[in-house]
């Protein structure tokens, strides 16, 4: 059985050669379920990018999908190179987070074209698309709100579905639980945080899949 893990940095993992590879929450879950972890999550991914990860997982014939949404306050960089293309299934497109550290040309784009409200709306649309795509595929799946915590539309029913879980590893990154945080591991969680995340997620999987 192959489990697809889709998302942003919260779902990314260290390399197989890293001493802590087996201690990442995705690999703990895969071992518990006697499955192969197919980790598509990448740092900085937008929800659009996460949608393309789901598509890749379907092409790779994954059996189960665990999808972790990201903040809608990100955007796809379409003017650098030609990486956001149909030809490569949009796999190599660049994504960027809106923050003070953004590059000057990104701020030029943000000032002219970026709308936080539109990106939130796009996030809802993409979530609905992921939900319906996986529903139609017949695959087992769960979608976790994770870092998509802003401005849930009152008339949006997709976030009320049983397959959408109102939690994610992002919630462990808190001032109240500094022992779960790490600046050195790519998924932002300490080894203790990874263990806590895996236990909580296995509980959701057992209860909902």
Predicted regions mapped to residue ranges:
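Serine-esterase "nucleophile elbow" of acetyl-processing enzymes
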Residues: 1-48, 55, 190
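Alpha-helical cap/lid subdomain in secreted, periplasmic
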Residues: 55-209
């Amino acid at each position: 059985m192959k489990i697809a893990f889709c998302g942003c940095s919260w779902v990314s993992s260290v390399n197989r050669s890293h001493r802590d590879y087996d201690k990442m929450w995705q690999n703990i879950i895969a071992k518990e379920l006697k499955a192969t972890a197919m980790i598509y999550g990448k740092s900085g991914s937008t929800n659009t990018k996460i949608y393309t990860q789901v598509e890749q997982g379907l092409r790779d014939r994954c059996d189960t999908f665990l999808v972790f949404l990201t903040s809608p306050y990100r955007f796809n960089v379409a003017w650098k190179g030609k990486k956001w293309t149909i030809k490569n299934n949009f796999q190599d497109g660049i994504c960027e987070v809106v923050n003070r550290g953004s590059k000057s040309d990104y701020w030029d784009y943000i000032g002219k074209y970026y709308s936080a409200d539109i990106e939130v709306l796009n996030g809802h649309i993409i979530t609905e698309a992921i939900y319906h795509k996986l529903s139609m595929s017949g695959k087992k799946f769960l979608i976790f709100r994770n870092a998509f915590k802003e401005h849930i539309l009152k008339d949006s029913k997709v976030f009320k579905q049983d397959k959408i879980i109102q939690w994610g590893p992002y919630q462990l990154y808190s001032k109240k639980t500094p022992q779960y945080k790490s600046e050195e591991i790519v998924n932002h969680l300490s080894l203790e945080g990874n263990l806590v995340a895996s236990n909580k997620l296995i509980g959701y999987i057992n209860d909902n899949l």
